[in-house]
Amino acid sequence: MDRKKYIGNDTLCLAESIEADNEILYESWNEHETIWGYNWQIPYSFDEYSAKFKNDSNSDIWSWGAVIMRLEDNAVIGRIGLSAGLPDLTITIFKTHRNQQYGTMAFLLGVRYCFEVLRLDKIHAGCFEDNTASRKMIERCGFKRNPEGDETENHIFTGEDRLQLDFVIENPCRPK
């Protein structure tokens, strides 16, 4: 099935999520590292997820979302989304594709899409203070710390307080 491609480079593209992606996306949301990184566990069965929790613009949770596709083989290697409300860009790279710079490439594509196509003035991104890899990726993509946006959450597994760091990037093409 052909899918809409939102934006890409020589290695990856961000493309629309299709029904065939539901299984791998659902599995990703149930992966321990993803739950730990988002501090959230999906409360839906697979059927409920397939019916209502799609990472696309038809969702009340996401204002935009896409799968991350590797162009050499069209493999879906992750997901990226912009949350509804506060424009917060989120990403998950599936476990077998981590530590290969795909996250940075895809996040940069997501930032470009948000600024060039969605025409946003600024975007937020966040990670927990113990997530060094995500923090480095966010900073490599040009985001700056925004301590006013930091939030403390109870850890999903331990119940302890956990600080989520906020970062922001402004559209360089928008008037200040």
Predicted regions and their residues:
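Acyl-donor (CoA/ACP) binding surface of acyl/acetyltransferases
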Residues: 1-32, 65-176
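Acidic, low-complexity intrinsically disordered regions
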Residues: 25, 32, 36, 58-60
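Conserved GNAT-fold acetyl-CoA-binding loop/helix
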Residues: 33-54
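A short helix-loop-beta-strand connector motif used in the catalytic cores of GNAT acetyltransferases and
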Residues: 54-67
